[in-house]
Regions:
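Metal-dependent amide/peptide-bond hydrolase catalytic core
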Residues: 2-11, 65, 97, 181-186, ...
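Short beta-strand segments
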Residues: 90-91, 150-152, 177-180, 202-204, ...
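Glycine/serine-rich anion-binding loops at beta->alpha junctions
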Residues: 97, 113-127, 209
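Acidic/histidine-rich catalytic neighborhood of metal-dependent amide-processing enzymes
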Residues: 122-192, 236, 387
Length: 389
């Protein structure tokens, strides 16, 4: 559709409100291909389903193989000039759901609701990207900042393989839009995310017979109990600092003083300064029981996504464009991490642009069609925006 001017927000919204059937078609084609993170062999089919849609839109698609994951997909405009600024749409096509989930949790359309494994987190976000790009083509709009897309297959297990690609791309981007689900049924955008640290505490004690000579032993379990109390004392809920000992293991038999014990700890913070301070506190814990020793390993695999000046700027842009669409957008802090935590270290990042719905990682996972089409309209307008100052 040729136009002499850029379409108004109302034109874009009206067009996308007519794309309900296309949204359902695209989403069903992806959800029916199950793609659990821990089954890399399942990822190739879903990647091809998605790649075909981008190629149909004229994008050059690069399939990046993975060693321990199902690989990645990078799509870009072939006519992008060397050195020209780009904007990245970021997402993942892996899900937490095991093979066979569709047998008892099928893809289902019920009025304005779509249910199924991965519809909300986050195959619906990939559909939004496609709908937004289709909309730009429909109105014959050429964005001044070239759009690119990166999708990985290991986000749900920490992006250990794809993280370096994401960092390398983010450095060269004017901005990044993360198509993870929005926050809550009111659809808040995620302008901050907590950083996530993972630490493993290993205690070594001395085995002894629990009845004949307990004094000759040094209980690794007793020592671990002291460490756990020290760890929980680091919680500061007012600041949003959470320290959780999620798993513990140890001992040989009931009648043996435990020579070994171990705990795995999840830590979440809102700022880089808090991450550094709490890391130092955890690593400085000393054993309290004579005859025991401690080894604590760990780090923050996802740094906090903070409300930096660049992130505030892109939020203000989204808020203004949302108002043009008649949307009253709100922002929020997410307790979980995403690949947006990584890109935020390098460039302006706006997260939670994906579907409006509920039930990520839960059996009631669903999205709202009408609200998700509105988010596709918002993404369309963001893609057309000028380069950030």
């Amino acid at each position: 559709m040729k136009m002499d001017r850029h379409p108004a927000a109302s034109d874009i919204l009206q067009h996308l409100q007519g794309q309900r059937d296309e949204l359902i078609r695209l989403l069903e084609s992806m959800v029916r291909v199950e793609s659990p993170s821990d089954e890399p062999g399942t990822q190739h089919e879903i990647r091809e389903v998605i790649a075909a849609e981008f190629e149909q839109l004229g994008f050059r698609v690069h399939r990046i193989p993975g060693r321990n994951s199902g690989g990645m997909l990078y799509a870009s405009y072939p006519e992008r000039a060397r050195g020209a600024k780009a904007q990245l749409m970021l997402g993942h096509y892996d899900t937490v759901w095991p093979l066979g989930t569709l047998d008892n949790m099928p893809f289902e359309v019920d009025g304005d609701i779509i249910r199924g494994p991965g519809v909300y987190d986050m195959k619906g976000g990939i559909v939004q990207v496609l709908l937004a790009l289709q909309t730009l083509r429909y109105f014959d709009i050429k964005p001044k900042v070239y759009p690119a897309i990166f999708l990985n297959s290991d986000e749900e297990i920490g992006s250990r393989e794809s993280g370096r690609y994401i960092s390398a791309l983010a450095v060269h981007m004017d901005r990044v839009f993360v198509l993870e689900p929005s926050l809550g049924l009111d659809g808040r955008l995620k302008t901050a995310r907590k950083g996530i640290g993972r630490f493993t505490v290993t205690v070594t004690g001395e085995a002894a017979h629990a009845g004949l000579d307990p004094g000759a032993g040094a209980s690794a379990i007793l020592e671990l109990s002291h460490v756990i109390q020290s760890l929980f004392a680091l919680n500061d809920f007012d600041k949003g600092i959470t320290v959780n000992v999620g798993t513990i293991d140890g001992g040989l038999r009931p009648n043996v003083v435990a020579p070994k014990s171990q705990a795995v700890v999840d830590v979440r913070v809102s700022t880089q300064a808090e991450a550094e301070a709490i890391t130092a506190s955890i690593l400085s814990i000393e054993p309290a029981i004579p005859g025991t020793s401690l080894n604590i390993d760990g780090y923050f695999g996802r740094q906090p996504m903070e409300r930096t000046p660049a992130n505030r700027q892109i939020w203000q842009l989204a808020h203004r464009l949302g108002a043009e669409l008649g949307l009253e957008l709100e922002q929020g802090l997410a307790g979980g991490g995403s690949d947006g935590n990584t890109t935020s270290l390098y460039t302006a990042t706006l997260d939670g642009l994906g579907p409006v719905g509920d039930g990520a990682h839960a059996r009631h996972e669903h999205l709202l069609i009408s609200k998700t089409l509105e988010r596709a309209a918002l993404l369309s307008m963001l893609l057309v925006a000028d380069k950030l100052e």
